[in-house]
Design a protein with these regions (language model features):
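Soluble extramembrane regions of membrane proteins in the secretory/endomembrane system
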Residues: 1-173
Length: 173
């Protein structure tokens, strides 16, 4: 049970181009797969990728995947969910699964520039929305990441390619 399972949605809105939400997630996942394939002969585990939609509509894409295709979650040992509320700043680890000692240790040991603090989880749980990770966080270990600086770009016409940050994208991976 050591598969990595990043997932992402394409959740752009009518006015947003989706370069940040969720171009960041898509790009990070594709680059992660590209890098992982270079070392596939050294790995003992696999990688699964799930792209969902309708996160903003009560997590409907992830709920459907979990309800109707539950077998895709078999043998998944870790979920990485990539979010982007803003285009700038570090990729914050803002939520983990319960009993997270091993997950936090994995992050601390392997992230080049880990960035998190316990208040992030408190703030996140006060927000009116959730993430796809909500559906599995009680059953599969995982981590939720997001850049949040300049959230005024979120779901607006400012969510475009002119406002992406290569430094922020690089911090995710």
């Amino acid at each position: 049970h050591d598969s990595r399972y990043p997932w992402k949605l394409m959740g752009d809105t009518v006015t947003a181009m989706g370069a940040i939400d969720d171009g960041y997630g898509l790009g990070v996942i594709l680059e992660s797969i590209h890098q992982a394939l270079k070392y596939r002969n050294e790995w003992n585990q696999g990688i699964k990728v799930l792209f969902t939609d309708a996160e903003e509509v009560d997590l409907q894409g992830m709920k459907a995947a979990h309800q109707y295709n539950k077998e895709i979650f078999d043998n998944v040992g870790l979920i990485l969910n990539i979010e982007a509320r803003g285009p700038f700043g570090p990729a914050l680890l803002f939520e983990t699964s319960m009993g997270n000692e091993k997950v936090i240790q994995l992050y601390a040991d392997h992230a080049r520039y880990p960035f998190t603090y316990s208040l992030m989880n408190v703030v996140y749980h006060q927000m009116p929305n959730g993430s796809d990770f909500n559906i599995t966080r009680d059953s599969i270990p995982g981590m939720n990441f997001s850049a949040i600086a300049d959230i005024n770009h979120y779901h607006t016409d400012l969510d475009n390619i002119d406002n992406i940050s290569e430094k922020t994208i690089g911090h995710y991976g």
